[in-house]
Amino acid sequence: MLARFVACTVAVLALASGALAQTYPAKPVRIIVPFSAGGLTDVLGRGIANELTKLWGQRVLVENRAGANTIIAAELVAKSPPDGYTILLANDPTLSLNQYMYSKLPYDPVRDLTPVINILQSVTVLVVTPSLAANTLQELIAMAKARPGELTYGTFGYGSSTHLDTLELGTMAGIKLNHIPFKGIAEVLPAVMSGQINMALSAVAPALANIRSGRLKALAYAGAQRNKVLPNVPTYAEAGLPGFFTHGWFGFVVPAGTPREVIEKIAADTSKVITTREFDEKFISGVGMELINQGPAEYAEFLVKDRAQYARRVKEANVKQD
């Protein structure tokens, strides 16, 4: 009798799970973007939202909740109902860096947020102001060594991923640079173009048009191979500094406790969207980014390694926000 009851219960649960996946989404879905409108993450989020709206027949809305190095947006999603209707477009600070940079967070990135799909990575390019008398990485390094602490670089703020990346670049190159923190890439790149600061590490996408127009000078790309949209920009290895590799990544996470069937559906349908030729050309490889497309299990494994890497880097750089 007990065995029969258990079998019936399992069957009912299986049917319920399948039905849940088939009926989701039954109402509008929110994608929370932890940055202001118009930036790289926002554009990506809106591109995915538009395609998922078509696929699901339900509106997928983007909400911008910028501030506090993505903490505001992450807390909102972590404390939302675990039903799949609130999705965070997270990046490496959200899930890997902030827990080591801040002594207290209002969310636990491991316990409170569940990986869905790792979408893409954005490898950085070193850009300098066009008037700077350095046309190669080695010329820049020589200039920095001759003028220690004088050359300036911009980042998204103290303790940001771009801050850590540039500190690591300085250590590997044996140079000392002067840090000028900004609020985001929308402030950093104009400062480089105007000569307010000398250089910055940037994702390719927001810098691409200005590199092509000559308003920014690109000296090195931090990937294993050259980027197809910047074929004349050497890798750091080609430029004489092997081993320097930096990247940011973007992926979906949901509140812990979200049904597995809903997570799998979001992952599968997002994968369909991002692997089309049209989407890739408009939002990924066509603007200098690289597809990752890792499902929930692979994404979780990736995060374990990424967190360990950030723990080491924060310790070595000796930078903390509080």
List the model feature ranges, each with a label.
Residues A16-G18:
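N-terminal signal peptide c-region/cleavage motif recognized by signal peptidases
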Residues G38, D92-P93, T129-A134, T155-S160, ...:
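Short coil/turn segments
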Residues M1-T9:
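Bacterial N-terminal signal peptides that target proteins for export
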Residues T94-K104, E168-M172, M199-V233:
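A ligand-binding cleft/hinge motif common to bilobed small-molecule-binding domains
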Residues A21-R111, E150, G174-L201, N210, ...:
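N-terminal (or domain-start) structured segment
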Residues A26-P28, E238, R260-D322:
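An extracytoplasmic/periplasmic, membrane-proximal ligand-sensing/linker region
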Residues L76-Y85, Y100-E187, Y236, W249-F283:
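Hinge/capping helix and adjacent helix->loop/strand transition within the periplasmic-binding protein
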